[in-house]
């Protein structure tokens, strides 16, 4: 990451600490298994610290996102700011409900990108014309690995889309 890109108090996406809970000797292997599961599946929040005590509260079920509604709103509006804000709020709500899982963020961003492809196709714009592939791939990878990266990826996508929309005007 470049200096100044991080949110105040946030660690870069590459940092994460896993904090177990105190355990008696007989339960250490169970605690280790929990920490390994967390490392595999959970997305670090802005602090970069994942606590074993909170892991059980992370939602495992994928909640459908109203993509058709968002796509229709993007197509009829001169500004994409409202959809951007709704997506950011959706992620914040998921974070507050216990955290994010990597499988959730992967699916969320796959679906979001598919809807952006549809949005651009209806405007006769090719995705690769407006997005730099190297920058896009870097930000997409970080989006799945940290909450900070997830929010930054949404901002990146919508900044580029807003810029394209202004160029069309």
Model-derived regions, located:
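Cytosolic nucleotide-utilizing catalytic cores of signal-transduction proteins
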Residues: 1-169
């Amino acid at each position: 990451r470049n200096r100044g890109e991080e949110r105040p108090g946030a660690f870069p996406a590459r940092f994460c600490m896993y904090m177990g809970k105190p355990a008696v000797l007989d339960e250490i292997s169970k605690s280790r298994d929990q920490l390994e599961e967390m490392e595999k599946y959970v997305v670090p929040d802005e602090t970069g610290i994942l606590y074993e005590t909170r892991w059980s509260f992370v939602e495992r079920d994928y909640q459908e996102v109203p993509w058709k509604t968002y796509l229709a709103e993007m197509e009829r509006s001169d500004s994409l700011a409202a959809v951007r804000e709704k997506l950011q709020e959706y992620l914040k709500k998921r974070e507050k409900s216990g955290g994010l899982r990597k499988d959730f963020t992967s699916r969320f961003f796959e679906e979001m990108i598919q809807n952006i492809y549809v949005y651009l196709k209806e405007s006769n714009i090719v995705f690769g014309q407006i997005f730099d592939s190297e920058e896009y791939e870097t930000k997409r990878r970080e989006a799945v690995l940290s909450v900070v990266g997830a929010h930054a990826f949404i901002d990146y996508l919508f900044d580029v889309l807003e810029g394209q929309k202004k160029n069309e005007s």
